[in-house]
Amino acid sequence: MRTADDAFSDAVSGQALTLLVRALPAIKSAPQDLDARLEGQLGMWLSISGSSTGVGVGVSHAIGHTLGGSYGVPHGITSCVTLPSSLRWNASANLNRQREVSRLMGKPEALAADLVADLVKRLGLPGRLRDVGIRREDLQAIADHTMHDAPVRTNPRKIEHPSDIVEILELAW
């Protein structure tokens, strides 16, 4: 979701995504599969490497901070409900990067947002804000709070006003 290229983070994140997209459904269908679990663990470990290099994480993560800190939504679940809508909202600013995500997920012709939403659904996880108890009347307060979170400044598409975040939240609601 970031704006700048970083060859190291791109390579590591790409490998993480490839591993996780393969491992997570396998783990769901066969939790005892130690090879799938190892692949998932390696994918998870690689996925956090970008944060150690200072790569910005964007609005999806910023909204997640608000949902977790103020509404008790677990961090992993916040990504399930905010990432597809953030991808959709950001597509005008980073469509080529999103096409790479689609390629890494094995379907280069599909939209990254659709692939992520489908993965969340196949894993049986909540995919909308209302699925985790967020009320529509809370969207403005969530947006107002999220505007002050640092990852908003690293979003690929500039966020200038809380109404931009409300648009993303409406897509996720």
Question: Which residues are covered by each model-predicted region?
Answer:
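Carboxylate- and glycine-rich phosphate/diphosphate-binding segment that chelates Mg2+/Mn2+
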Residues: M1-V55, P156-R157, S163
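Glycine-rich phosphate/pyrophosphate-binding beta-alpha loops
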Residues: W45-S79, D149-R153
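Alpha-helix N-cap/helix-start motif at coil-to-helix transitions, marked by capping-box chemistry
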Residues: A7-T18, L38, V57, I77, ...
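Alpha-helical scaffold segments in soluble metabolic enzymes
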Residues: A11, Q15-A26, E39-L42, L46, ...
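Alpha-helix C-capping/helix-to-loop hinge sites
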Residues: T3, A23, I27, S47-G50, ...
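Active-site pocket-lining segment
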Residues: G72-R130
